[in-house]
Amino acid sequence: MYLNACRALTLISVLSLLACNSEPEKKQATPSKEIAKAQTGSWGDQGDGTYINPILNADYPDSDIEQVGDTYYMITSKQHMSPGMPILESKDMVNWTNVGHVFNSLSWAPEYNWDRMNGYSFGTWAGDLAYHEGTWYCYQIDYQHGLMVATSKDIKGPWSKPIMMLPKSEVLDDPAVFWDEDTHKAYIIINTAGKQKEASNTIEGNENRIYEMSWDGTKILDEGKLVYTGMGAEAAKIYKIDGTWYIFLAQWTMGDMSTKPGVKNPKNDRKQIVLRSKESIYGPYEVKTVLEKGTVFNNRSASQGALMQAPDNSWWYMHQLIQNDDIPFQGRPQCLEPVTWVDGWPIIGVDEDNDGIGEPVKTYKKPIDGYPVTAPRTDDDFSSPKLGFQWEWNHNPRNTHWSLTERPGWLRLKASKVLPNEKGYGPNINEWTNNDGSDSDFWRANNTLSQRIMGITTGTAVAKFDVSGMKPHQLAGFVRYGGVFNLLGVEVDEHGKKHLFYMEPMGEKTVGPEITVNDLYIRTSNRSNQAIYEYSFDGKNFKRFGPTFTIAFGKWTGDRLGLFSWNDKEDAGYIDVDWFTYDYDGPKAANQ
């Protein structure tokens, strides 16, 4: 993220804000004229000129935002999902819609392919989105492979194949770039952790280095210079405002070292800090904490995001809530905070306890009035020859084994033989996945298609299936998965008989009634992190099947609603999906 010369023309002088030492004047909230046509709920746009955080209450983590003209563009990480690095756009910072992905596939390594599925938790991590001299840039670090960049003339693509810039041996994560128009130099800051740490640096934590880049943003020109070390310090963003350099970083404050960062512990907090220098991008820097978790989101820390400005020159900050909570099952959502400036420092949110540090707001006036309530699309009737941007595959799909055109108006998922339960296939079993069912067949079954759940209160999704194309040893149906999976579907035995079945996270099956009709409707509902399945043959009368189960965050992924099809013995059989609908307690566009 950077504020280039074109964007700088739209920015108010921060000095005028500093002189006030107060919040920008609050205008009267104006409701959208189209609110009656759309749905609101317990989060996001409320239709009355206000919003409730999180404004994007779903698994859209590690955001970065770039503004071009009157439009804001966001990228978020999505690990091993393909296509990777979702792109969203907004006119008002509150209502966001999906418009594409940076990476059509995770093409740079074999572990992300359908015949390996060995890239769980890796793939696309926190990226940086930039627009410079007519070109879009997306930088990201794959923990297993290193720093890369993709480019495009159009935010909606096509994007180039990634160009590798630095190896994994030198970098860890979270790059951010800046083009300095004053000196005609380009820079990138990277969390190198301890990979280049020298004995002379006795400060505990991650090292963050600034490298000089070529002006075209594709080459590293030097060895980098250390600018900051801190406990878990990462997710840097660079800004130059009125000649002063600011580096925003997320950093852990550990009041209790008995638990790891990221584990629920009220004594620990991943805070937002800011470095400030009036001399050079390399410092020296002053340091200040500008946002802490506060009380409105229980124990969830609030940090890591991007600074923005509205047409009225007010400043705003988008950040995520991290996973240090009992039930962060929806993943890491996005929150929008007002920003005020005091003595040249930003305060993010509202300083509730007057200690000079902001805390997140729960509800606030929208930064920009007049736009309709909307949200990322969820429903699908599969009438388009292309998949909607809400959908992503578990690893790169086997493209010969799915279709939207073989039966127009339906999604066809052909079954492949499940991959072997051997090293190099499926999740790596380690301290984070021990005894969670990661060796179950589901994790090695390719072409599972899914989308994020929305919100944490209630939700109900329904899909209609045609099971007439299924073959012996095939399993297909509906799955909820993130850290664990639970699925309900149809299994065909060796004699060709179809039965309903439920499978729990360790792979144990409960077999249900025989299915002798072609049409099957599966419905799943959740209240908080407790979910159930139901089935129907007519779409009206549903019966419960299987237990109440717990949905969970894991593999750096929140709970997802998905469609699966695999075969235990061979590549054989298919299932057709007519439509998918999803209702939840949150904003939804009128045209869904």
Curated annotation (Swiss-Prot):
Per the entry, induction is:
By ulvan and rhamnose.
- Which InterPro entries does the UniProt entry name for this protein? ConA-like_dom_sf, GH43_C2, Glyco_hydro_43, Glyco_hydro_beta-prop_sf, Glycosyl_Hydrlase_43
Keyword terms, alphabetized: Cell outer membrane, Glycosidase, Hydrolase, Lipoprotein, Membrane, Palmitate, Signal
Report the domain of life of the source organism. Bacteria
Q: Which residues form the signal peptide?
A: 1-19
Q: What is its EC number?
A: 3.2.1.-
Could you cite one Gene Ontology molecular function of this protein? hydrolase activity, hydrolyzing O-glycosyl compounds
Q: Where is the lipid attached (N-palmitoyl cysteine)?
A: C20
Q: Where is the lipid attached (S-diacylglycerol cysteine)?
A: C20
Location(s) in or outside the cell: Cell outer membrane
Q: How does it sit in the membrane?
A: Lipid-anchor
Query: What single Pfam family name could you report for this chain, choosing any that match?
Result: Glyco_hydro_43
Report the principal subcellular site.
membrane
Q: What biological processes does GO assign it?
A: carbohydrate metabolic process
A GO CC term assigned to this protein in UniProt: cell outer membrane
User: What is the purpose of this protein?
Assistant: Xylosidase involved in ulvan degradation. Ulvan is the main polysaccharide component of the Ulvales (green seaweed) cell wall. It is composed of disaccharide building blocks comprising 3-sulfated rhamnose (Rha3S) linked to D-glucuronic acid (GlcA), L-iduronic acid (IduA), or D-xylose (Xyl). Beta-xylosidase converts Xyl-Rha3S, a product of alpha-L-rhamnosidase acting on Rha-Xyl-Rha3S oligosaccharides, further to Xyl and Rha3S.
- What family is reported? Belongs to the glycosyl hydrolase 43 family.
Supply the name of the protein.
Beta-xylosidase
* Organism this protein belongs to: Formosa agariphila (strain DSM 15362 / KCTC 12365 / LMG 23005 / KMM 3901 / M-2Alg 35-1)
What is the taxonomic lineage of the source species?
Bacteria, Pseudomonadati, Bacteroidota, Flavobacteriia, Flavobacteriales
